[in-house]
Amino acid sequence: VERPVWAAVAGAAATVLINGRTDATHHAVHLRPGDRLEVVTPPTGLRSYLAVRGGIDVPSVLGSRSTDLLSDLGPTPLQPGTRLPVGRTPQPFPHIGLVRTPPVQTPLEVHLAPGPRADWLTEEGLRSLADQVWTVSNDSDRTGVRLQGAPLERLVRAELPSEGIIRGAVQVPPTGLPLIFGPDHPVTGGYPVVGVVPENDCDRVAQLRPGDGLRFRWRATPATDRQPLDSVRSTGRSHAQGPGRQPR
Protein backbone atom coordinates (compact mmCIF):
# COMPACT_ATOMS: atom_id res chain seq x y z
CA VAL A 1 0.00 0.00 0.00
CA GLU A 2 1.40 3.38 -1.03
CA ARG A 3 -1.12 5.68 0.68
CA PRO A 4 -3.76 5.37 3.41
CA VAL A 5 -6.77 3.37 2.23
CA TRP A 6 -9.71 1.40 3.57
CA ALA A 7 -10.05 -2.14 2.21
CA ALA A 8 -12.14 -5.27 2.77
CA VAL A 9 -12.04 -8.89 1.61
CA ALA A 10 -15.30 -10.78 1.05
CA GLY A 11 -16.50 -13.89 -0.76
CA ALA A 12 -14.94 -17.23 0.16
CA ALA A 13 -13.67 -17.38 3.76
CA ALA A 14 -10.01 -16.75 2.99
CA THR A 15 -7.36 -16.00 5.60
CA VAL A 16 -6.29 -12.35 5.44
CA LEU A 17 -2.80 -11.35 6.55
CA ILE A 18 -1.84 -7.74 7.25
CA ASN A 19 1.90 -7.42 7.69
CA GLY A 20 1.94 -11.14 8.49
CA ARG A 21 -0.75 -10.94 11.16
CA THR A 22 -4.07 -12.74 10.71
CA ASP A 23 -7.15 -10.58 10.22
CA ALA A 24 -10.78 -11.37 9.41
CA THR A 25 -12.76 -11.12 6.19
CA HIS A 26 -16.03 -9.24 5.71
CA HIS A 27 -15.03 -6.07 7.53
CA ALA A 28 -13.17 -2.88 6.66
CA VAL A 29 -9.53 -2.46 7.64
CA HIS A 30 -7.47 0.72 7.49
CA LEU A 31 -4.14 0.27 5.70
CA ARG A 32 -1.23 2.70 6.03
CA PRO A 33 1.61 3.37 3.59
CA GLY A 34 3.96 0.39 3.57
CA ASP A 35 1.38 -2.10 4.86
CA ARG A 36 1.21 -5.44 3.05
CA LEU A 37 -2.11 -7.25 2.65
CA GLU A 38 -2.18 -10.91 1.62
CA VAL A 39 -5.20 -13.07 0.79
CA VAL A 40 -4.49 -16.77 1.39
CA THR A 41 -6.29 -19.48 -0.58
CA PRO A 42 -9.49 -20.32 1.37
CA PRO A 43 -10.07 -23.85 2.73
CA THR A 44 -13.46 -23.97 0.97
CA GLY A 45 -14.95 -21.91 -1.82
CA LEU A 46 -13.27 -20.63 -4.95
CA ARG A 47 -13.52 -16.84 -5.21
CA SER A 48 -12.60 -14.04 -2.83
CA TYR A 49 -13.06 -10.32 -3.54
CA LEU A 50 -10.86 -7.39 -2.53
CA ALA A 51 -12.57 -3.99 -2.36
CA VAL A 52 -10.89 -0.64 -1.70
CA ARG A 53 -12.65 2.58 -0.74
CA GLY A 54 -12.56 4.84 -3.77
CA GLY A 55 -12.45 1.96 -6.22
CA ILE A 56 -9.76 1.00 -8.72
CA ASP A 57 -9.04 4.07 -10.85
CA VAL A 58 -8.50 2.58 -14.31
CA PRO A 59 -10.19 3.60 -17.59
CA SER A 60 -13.80 2.48 -17.94
CA VAL A 61 -14.72 0.41 -21.02
CA LEU A 62 -18.44 0.12 -21.82
CA GLY A 63 -19.25 1.23 -18.27
CA SER A 64 -17.00 -1.32 -16.56
CA ARG A 65 -13.50 -1.38 -15.10
CA SER A 66 -13.32 -5.18 -15.17
CA THR A 67 -11.28 -7.22 -17.63
CA ASP A 68 -13.18 -9.50 -20.01
CA LEU A 69 -10.64 -12.12 -21.07
CA LEU A 70 -12.93 -13.71 -23.69
CA SER A 71 -13.48 -10.51 -25.69
CA ASP A 72 -10.16 -8.86 -24.69
CA LEU A 73 -11.96 -5.78 -23.35
CA GLY A 74 -11.01 -3.69 -20.37
CA PRO A 75 -7.75 -3.10 -18.51
CA THR A 76 -4.68 -5.27 -18.99
CA PRO A 77 -5.00 -8.50 -16.96
CA LEU A 78 -3.26 -8.41 -13.59
CA GLN A 79 0.29 -9.71 -13.31
CA PRO A 80 2.77 -9.86 -10.41
CA GLY A 81 4.00 -6.33 -9.75
CA THR A 82 0.99 -4.57 -11.29
CA ARG A 83 0.27 -1.21 -9.58
CA LEU A 84 -3.41 -0.39 -9.14
CA PRO A 85 -4.30 3.28 -8.58
CA VAL A 86 -7.10 3.99 -6.12
CA GLY A 87 -9.76 6.59 -6.92
CA ARG A 88 -10.98 9.48 -4.81
CA THR A 89 -12.57 8.57 -1.51
CA PRO A 90 -16.31 9.26 -1.66
CA GLN A 91 -18.13 11.07 1.14
CA PRO A 92 -19.75 10.21 3.47
CA PHE A 93 -18.72 6.77 4.69
CA PRO A 94 -21.48 4.29 3.69
CA HIS A 95 -23.47 2.32 6.26
CA ILE A 96 -24.52 -1.07 4.92
CA GLY A 97 -25.62 -4.37 6.40
CA LEU A 98 -23.22 -7.28 6.69
CA VAL A 99 -23.99 -10.36 4.60
CA ARG A 100 -21.48 -13.13 5.10
CA THR A 101 -20.86 -15.79 2.48
CA PRO A 102 -22.00 -19.13 3.96
CA PRO A 103 -19.44 -21.94 3.96
CA VAL A 104 -19.52 -24.14 0.87
CA GLN A 105 -20.95 -27.52 1.84
CA THR A 106 -20.50 -30.39 -0.58
CA PRO A 107 -22.50 -31.81 -2.10
CA LEU A 108 -24.11 -28.41 -2.60
CA GLU A 109 -27.88 -28.59 -3.10
CA VAL A 110 -29.32 -26.08 -5.57
CA HIS A 111 -32.86 -25.53 -6.78
CA LEU A 112 -33.75 -26.19 -10.40
CA ALA A 113 -36.76 -24.78 -12.21
CA PRO A 114 -38.00 -26.51 -15.39
CA GLY A 115 -36.40 -25.19 -18.57
CA PRO A 116 -38.02 -24.65 -21.99
CA ARG A 117 -36.68 -28.00 -23.26
CA ALA A 118 -37.16 -30.09 -20.12
CA ASP A 119 -39.21 -32.66 -22.00
CA TRP A 120 -36.29 -33.35 -24.33
CA LEU A 121 -35.06 -35.68 -21.60
CA THR A 122 -36.64 -39.06 -20.96
CA GLU A 123 -38.45 -39.55 -17.69
CA GLU A 124 -35.45 -41.47 -16.42
CA GLY A 125 -33.20 -38.61 -17.55
CA LEU A 126 -35.27 -36.11 -15.56
CA ARG A 127 -35.05 -38.27 -12.46
CA SER A 128 -31.34 -38.93 -12.91
CA LEU A 129 -30.65 -35.20 -13.18
CA ALA A 130 -31.89 -34.72 -9.61
CA ASP A 131 -31.20 -38.13 -8.06
CA GLN A 132 -27.44 -38.30 -8.51
CA VAL A 133 -24.59 -36.29 -7.04
CA TRP A 134 -22.69 -34.54 -9.83
CA THR A 135 -18.98 -33.72 -9.67
CA VAL A 136 -17.61 -30.35 -10.84
CA SER A 137 -15.23 -30.87 -13.77
CA ASN A 138 -11.75 -29.40 -14.18
CA ASP A 139 -13.03 -27.81 -17.41
CA SER A 140 -15.25 -25.37 -15.49
CA ASP A 141 -14.72 -21.60 -15.66
CA ARG A 142 -16.71 -18.36 -15.65
CA THR A 143 -18.44 -19.45 -18.86
CA GLY A 144 -19.98 -22.44 -17.17
CA VAL A 145 -19.65 -25.19 -14.59
CA ARG A 146 -19.35 -28.55 -16.32
CA LEU A 147 -20.58 -31.58 -14.40
CA GLN A 148 -19.42 -35.18 -14.45
CA GLY A 149 -21.62 -38.17 -13.64
CA ALA A 150 -23.92 -40.69 -15.32
CA PRO A 151 -24.96 -39.21 -18.71
CA LEU A 152 -28.59 -38.14 -19.05
CA GLU A 153 -30.78 -39.93 -21.57
CA ARG A 154 -32.33 -37.64 -24.14
CA LEU A 155 -35.75 -38.34 -25.62
CA VAL A 156 -35.17 -36.06 -28.62
CA ARG A 157 -31.98 -36.66 -30.61
CA ALA A 158 -32.38 -33.74 -33.01
CA GLU A 159 -30.43 -30.53 -32.44
CA LEU A 160 -31.79 -27.00 -32.09
CA PRO A 161 -31.34 -23.72 -33.87
CA SER A 162 -29.54 -21.40 -31.47
CA GLU A 163 -31.73 -20.11 -28.63
CA GLY A 164 -31.18 -17.43 -26.01
CA ILE A 165 -29.13 -18.32 -22.91
CA ILE A 166 -29.15 -16.79 -19.43
CA ARG A 167 -26.95 -17.24 -16.39
CA GLY A 168 -28.04 -20.38 -14.56
CA ALA A 169 -29.35 -22.16 -17.66
CA VAL A 170 -28.64 -25.91 -17.50
CA GLN A 171 -27.82 -27.18 -20.97
CA VAL A 172 -27.44 -30.83 -21.98
CA PRO A 173 -25.11 -31.41 -24.97
CA PRO A 174 -24.92 -34.74 -26.88
CA THR A 175 -22.59 -36.16 -24.20
CA GLY A 176 -25.51 -36.12 -21.76
CA LEU A 177 -23.39 -34.28 -19.17
CA PRO A 178 -25.03 -31.01 -18.04
CA LEU A 179 -23.46 -27.57 -18.00
CA ILE A 180 -24.57 -24.69 -15.74
CA PHE A 181 -23.90 -21.40 -17.52
CA GLY A 182 -22.09 -18.69 -15.55
CA PRO A 183 -21.69 -14.91 -15.93
CA ASP A 184 -19.54 -15.20 -19.09
CA HIS A 185 -22.14 -17.35 -20.86
CA PRO A 186 -22.69 -16.96 -24.62
CA VAL A 187 -25.72 -15.06 -25.84
CA THR A 188 -27.16 -18.13 -27.56
CA GLY A 189 -26.73 -21.90 -27.41
CA GLY A 190 -27.71 -24.80 -29.65
CA TYR A 191 -28.36 -27.55 -27.10
CA PRO A 192 -31.55 -28.04 -25.05
CA VAL A 193 -31.90 -26.08 -21.81
CA VAL A 194 -33.66 -28.51 -19.48
CA GLY A 195 -33.60 -26.40 -16.33
CA VAL A 196 -32.64 -23.06 -14.81
CA VAL A 197 -30.81 -22.49 -11.52
CA PRO A 198 -32.21 -19.40 -9.71
CA GLU A 199 -29.99 -16.33 -9.33
CA ASN A 200 -29.25 -16.72 -5.61
CA ASP A 201 -28.13 -20.33 -6.13
CA CYS A 202 -25.92 -19.27 -9.06
CA ASP A 203 -23.81 -17.29 -6.58
CA ARG A 204 -23.35 -20.46 -4.51
CA VAL A 205 -22.48 -22.54 -7.58
CA ALA A 206 -19.78 -19.98 -8.45
CA GLN A 207 -17.90 -20.97 -5.26
CA LEU A 208 -17.62 -24.66 -6.22
CA ARG A 209 -14.17 -26.06 -6.95
CA PRO A 210 -13.31 -28.90 -9.36
CA GLY A 211 -14.07 -32.14 -7.55
CA ASP A 212 -16.84 -30.66 -5.39
CA GLY A 213 -20.25 -32.33 -5.44
CA LEU A 214 -23.57 -30.81 -6.53
CA ARG A 215 -27.13 -32.09 -6.34
CA PHE A 216 -30.18 -30.58 -8.09
CA ARG A 217 -33.61 -30.31 -6.48
CA TRP A 218 -36.53 -29.84 -8.86
CA ARG A 219 -38.72 -26.91 -7.95
CA ALA A 220 -42.35 -26.88 -9.09
CA THR A 221 -43.54 -23.76 -10.89
CA PRO A 222 -45.65 -21.32 -8.78
CA ALA A 223 -48.61 -21.72 -11.14
CA THR A 224 -49.10 -25.41 -10.37
CA ASP A 225 -49.52 -27.67 -7.36
CA ARG A 226 -48.21 -30.68 -9.28
CA GLN A 227 -45.20 -32.67 -8.19
CA PRO A 228 -41.89 -31.42 -9.67
CA LEU A 229 -41.69 -34.01 -12.46
CA ASP A 230 -45.30 -33.33 -13.47
CA SER A 231 -44.47 -29.63 -13.50
CA VAL A 232 -41.46 -30.32 -15.70
CA ARG A 233 -43.58 -32.22 -18.20
CA SER A 234 -46.17 -29.46 -18.38
CA THR A 235 -43.60 -26.65 -18.63
CA GLY A 236 -41.35 -28.01 -21.36
CA ARG A 237 -42.28 -27.65 -25.01
CA SER A 238 -43.63 -30.79 -26.58
CA HIS A 239 -40.89 -32.59 -28.49
CA ALA A 240 -43.49 -33.53 -31.09
CA GLN A 241 -43.49 -29.92 -32.25
CA GLY A 242 -39.91 -30.29 -33.44
CA PRO A 243 -37.02 -27.85 -32.98
CA GLY A 244 -37.67 -24.22 -33.73
CA ARG A 245 -41.47 -24.54 -33.55
CA GLN A 246 -43.50 -22.37 -31.21
CA PRO A 247 -45.67 -24.04 -28.54
CA ARG A 248 -49.42 -23.93 -29.06
Give the ranges of each region predicted by the language model:
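Conserved "landmark" site that anchors the functional core of diverse proteins
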Residues: 1-248
